[in-house]
Amino acid sequence: MKFLSRAALAVAVLWAGSAPASAQVQMIIPWPAGGGTDIIGRLIQPVFTEAMGTQVVIRNVGGATGTIGTAELVRAKPDGQTILLTSMAPIAIQPSFMARPPYRADQLTAVCLVAEAPATLMTPTTTGIRTVADIVARARVNPGQLPYASGGVGGLGHLAMTGLSRAFGIEMNHIPFRGSGDSVQAMLSGTVPMLTAEANLVKQYGLHAVAVFAQQRSPDFPETPTMREQGLDLVYPLWTGIFTAPGTPEAMVARMDEACARTLRTASVIEGMTRAGHPIRYLNRQEFAAYVRAEAEKYAKLIRDSGLRQAD
């Protein structure tokens, strides 16, 4: 039998005082199974369960670029029994992108940042695309025709490529899919030639990394240039974090944050996240809340400047 650590046991005792003995914590992942966020959730779930001292059960609620599952959290009771593990799109982008968003980013209660990696522009090795210059040249030959995939309308892949298109004054054809899992499969089948998504897909599927939307080159792809090296101020991190329902008592949020910190320090989680290509980056609840505000403001400006907001 595996015993709880002293720290985890302390959290379990505190949690027991504020939740029914039979309570489970439901972890909503607002994306289909098999995508990057789902992989992270299944890597951390066993250790997070131990750290919380109560069973954490994953439930995938995909659709509408993550907003269906996120809206479910916003409507949840503030009793600590529902949390959300999500990548950034439904939090930092969709409330500014949608004509009638079902929630505001500031309604969610930030718990912790779990992982962060640079968005990576990738393509199969058979397309002949090697550089950003290759993409620009093709787009200029047939304006509006060159397709690219994304994990959904208004997702980071969509916004990143919008920023790239604006920087070079080109038009491309956006083909949205239901999460990164579906979009990479479409690319592998030849439906679309490129995708901007999490970097781990490059090694997983033997793809070519064209560029990273980051301040510095990735240690995993030291030969791949950043957009900044090409004179473009396009820095778009792909981050994943945990949130809980609006109005959840601070004591509960603090305990979730403590459990998150311990989970991300656990050797098996570090090993699994590294192997899966999802670099851990922990921010506590206060730091993460400030980070989310800054990210939401950044993407709100890009959406305004690009005229991307959905019409009523």
Residue positions per predicted region:
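Positively charged n-region of N-terminal signal peptides that target proteins for export
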Residues: 1-6
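Bacterial N-terminal signal peptides
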Residues: 7-18
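N-terminal (or domain-start) structured segment
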Residues: 20-107, 145, 153, 168-205, ...
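Hinge/capping helix and adjacent helix->loop/strand transition within the periplasmic-binding protein
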Residues: 25, 48, 75-81, 88, ...
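Stable alpha-helical elements in mature extracytoplasmic
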Residues: 36, 40, 44, 65, ...
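Short alpha-helical functional segments enriched in proximate histidine and acidic residues
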Residues: 51, 263, 295, 302
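Short beta-strand->loop
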Residues: 103-113, 171-175, 199-202, 206-235, ...
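Mature extracytoplasmic/periplasmic domains
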Residues: 265, 270-289
